[in-house]
Amino acid sequence: MWQINEVVLFDNDPYRILAIEDGQVVWMQISADKGVPQARAELLLMQYLDEGRLVRTDDPYVHLDLEEPSVDSVSFQKREEDYRKILPIINSKDRFDPKVRSELVEHVVQEHKVTKATVYKLLRRYWQRGQTPNALIPDYKNSGAPGERRSATGTAKIGRAREYGKGEGTKVTPEIERLFRLTIEKHLLNQKGTKTTVAYRRFVDLFAQYFPRIPQEDYPTLRQFRYFYDREYPKAQRLKSRVKAGVYKKDVRPLSSTATSQALGPGSRYEIDATIADIYLVDHHDRQKIIGRPTLYIVIDVFSRMITGFYIGFENPSYVVAMQAFVNACSDKTAICAQHDIEISSSDWPCVGLPDVLLADRGELMSHQVEALVSSFNVRVESAPPRRGDAKGIVESTFRTLQAEFKSFAPGIVEGSRIKSHGETDYRLDASLSVFEFTQIILRTILFRNNHLVMDKYDRDADFPTDLPSIPVQLWQWGMQHRTGSLRAVEQEQLRVALLPRRKVSISSFGVNLWGLYYSGSEILREGWLQRSTDIARPQHLEAAYDPVLVDTIYLFPQVGSRVFWRCNLTERSRQFKGLSFWEVWDIQAQEKHNKANAKQDELTKRRELEAFIQQTIQKANKLTPSTTEPKSTRIKQIKTNKKEAVTSERKKRAEHLKPSSSGDEAKVIPFNAVEADDQEDYSLPTYVPELFQDPPEKDES
């Protein structure tokens, strides 16, 4: 029922149970400055408990169990000395018998040369505070009112007197503290990075306005200013106030968890991010031509740290390129490795399928097409807060480790500032790798990292077997077998088209119009949408997906709200753009519009000249036309005769021009093939080319 050292409240006074002997409970009031242990019948305590006068409570000295003073400290020596004094008493089985205890106390007094009051004080301290050696630890930590402000009385400055310089200084009063606080909160607790010395000078300016009669040598010192700053403003508050909120959250705030703990297994969460690689590349065909720094996209699995997909190219980071890397992450990588002369098996890079969650930057997800991942493929998309690289800390750190593998060897590596010292060469001129070779290096690095890198700082879960090394591919394989394998199969082309950007298109007899380019396909011909008839009802408000990298093919969605698409190819009408990207097409169209606008200005000028000439000619003709009294009907009847005479006159003039200018024998024309006259070709009528009027052959495209 009762336990030794248990603390109870009796009539709201705390008591500690010291011993339980023969139905008697020995206890002692904790808060009393005097007194000795008392015995109470156990049944009486039960009665008090029933009456509600006795209740259990927490031990106010439980913290002493955790105290561990150092061996060379005064507290340790004091505890050991006091414990040795009372040890004969507390070890006696009759220690609670007043008569026996009195004799033992007398013996201690004689042996250690101390007073009875001291011995009883130590015993009382020992019993009240838990009956352990730590109960005798002195409360030095409470000395001096720690944590409490102490204000100096009087007008004299406290502390040692000034040894150097004039003046005696001044005491920091509440008014001076107010000026300290105003200066600190205005100049130090902000993101400007003001130094303490600069802020102190601003305080001096303010102090001089409030106390103009005090000489400068008696102004509060920089040391007093710093002391107040350190005392009143904790370091955590100062740090949080002096950095931007985004920087604090990203680089300073305490971390409460890890990304791995939030991932249930492989495919549970992917992170995607891009960086501009720290290397300059050259053109593959003309190595004298320096192209620039490539864009590197990485998709990584949080649980296993497997790099599941990538993109390397010169496109700027965008939604289109991010989705290209994501499609690569969901697809088999053996083909793309083979394109770069690297042979692998599917087990070397087993990351194929859709994840549960994709975490990316907000800018990379600013497209309505990302909704297709959510609605069509059930991939939850999360966006990281702006300027919060720590939200994608795993993929961010992967960029650093990936590039560290080749930075010490590769030429053209970005090195510090572009400002060159005397005699230093520009690192950009050292570039010699092409994008193909750089991709080979990155692929080899990814394969090494996925299959052989031992991650020393990987935070493992409790159920990981001890013989499982922290290597990404082995963590992936173990997670697929023993954890929730979240990857889901998907058809690569269907995923790629669903994630491409879309735009509304119009349909005419020329084909599907997208940005002035015309497309057609076998399904469109079969539907008869290109027939040149007003009776043809062509659908409106359709959308088409396009890959900005190549204009040759688009994907028309014939039904609103459906993922079914028709592949449409560029028609001959738009053949000038074949093989180009949409960015190149837009540049060409912009240049054509510019040239057209200039040509329109020339056309306007020449048209005005033409119209002026026509008007002048008409005016001249009107002046030359005499007035006549001949009836109108007669003049109209003469039109036929007049036209006949004009034709005759025209023929005579033409005949004059056809007469030979010199006499002589007529030349004989001999054909090269000496064909008969009847076999010669007749050019009196145009040549008929059947291909001009034939329909293009239908292609079975899907």
UniProtKB/Swiss-Prot annotation:
Spans annotated as DNA-binding domain 2 (DBD2): 173-233
Integrase catalytic domain boundaries: 262-480
Spans annotated as DNA-binding domain 1 (DBD1): 1-139
Substitution effect: S304A: No effect on recombination
Keyword Transferase: no
UniProt record, GO biological process: DNA integration; DNA transposition
Superkingdom, natural source: Bacteria
Outcome when changing D301A: Prevents DNA strand breakage and joining reactions
Keywords annotated in UniProt: DNA recombination, DNA-binding, Plasmid, Transposable element, Transposition
Effect of D283N: No effect on recombination
Residue ranges the UniProt entry marks as DNA-binding: 105-124
Annotated transmembrane regions: none
Role, per record: Sequence-specific, DNA-binding protein required for Tn7 transposition. Recognizes sequences necessary for recombination at both left and right ends of Tn7 and, together with TnsA, forms the transposase. TnsB executes the 3'-DNA strand breakage and joining reactions. TnsB binding introduces DNA bending. There are 3 DNA-binding sites in the left and 4 in the right end of Tn7; as TnsB levels increase more TnsB is bound, suggesting high protein levels contribute to transposon immunity. Binding of TnsB to the transposon right end represses expression of the downstream transposition genes.
Domain notes: Has 4 domains separated by linkers; DNA-binding domain 1 and 2 (DBD1 and DBD2), a catalytic domain (CD) and the C-terminus (not resolved in structure 7PIK). Binds 21 base pairs (bp) of double-stranded (ds)DNA; binds adjacent sites with a beads-on-a-string architecture making filaments. The CD of 1 subunit interacts with DBD1 of its own, the preceding and the following subunit. Contacts dsDNA via DBD1, DBD2 and the linker between them.
Name by which UniProt lists this protein: Transposon Tn7 transposition protein TnsB
Source organism of this protein record: Escherichia coli
Gene that encodes the chain: tnsB
